[in-house]
């Protein structure tokens, strides 16, 4: 009996089936760090970026500030460019997952803009963070995010909703 070789379409179908079988596992692994970050925040009494920690008005101010001070390098879409990293998307979200907003605030405040770091006020940075959070799909609340370091330390950046 002559053995038939798999056709190109059958190989594609097998590859697609394999990918579909692996996707749920990949999704579970991708959300595991966020699940742990949520659990840790709840255990320590901290809030997360999903707890409506900024106001819509503050995000609006942050958008204006971002467009004036940041968009030249980070682009209006927050996608980054040749000169600056992205401020949205999976790489950005996973790199900040589990860290405090105080860490993010300090990073921006001490390194931006790259040619004259530290010139932005704490309020400008906080407003821009509120805009970044809104842009990345986090829900606004009714109270502005404070720039007080102790309060920012108590808010964890968590990539995925609980």
Could you describe each region identified by the protein language model?
Residues 1-12:
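N-terminal secretory signal peptides that target proteins for export/translocation
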Residues 37-65, 116:
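Electrostatic cytochrome c docking/interface patches
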Residues 30, 34-37:
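Cleavable N-terminal signal peptides
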Residues 62, 66-77, 128, 132:
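The canonical Cys-X-X-Cys-His
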Residues 17-28:
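Bacterial N-terminal signal peptides
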């Amino acid at each position: 009996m002559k053995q038939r070789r798999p056709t190109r379409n059958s190989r594609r179908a097998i590859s697609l089936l394999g990918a579909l079988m692996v996707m749920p596992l990949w999704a579970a692994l991708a959300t595991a760090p966020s699940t742990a970050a949520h659990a840790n925040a709840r255990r320590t009494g901290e809030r997360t970026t999903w707890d409506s920690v900024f106001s819509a008005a503050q995000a609006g101010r942050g958008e204006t500030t971002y467009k004036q001070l940041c968009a030249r390098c980070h682009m209006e879409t927050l996608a980054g460019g040749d000169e600056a990293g992205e401020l949205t998307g999976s790489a950005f979200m996973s790199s900040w997952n589990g860290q405090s907003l105080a860490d993010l605030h300090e990073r921006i405040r001490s390194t931006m803009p790259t040619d004259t770091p530290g010139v932005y006020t704490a309020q400008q940075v906080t407003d821009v963070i509120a805009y970044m959070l809104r842009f990345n799909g986090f829900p606004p609340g009714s109270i502005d995010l404070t720039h007080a370091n102790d309060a920012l330390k108590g808010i964890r950046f968590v990539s995925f909703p609980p």
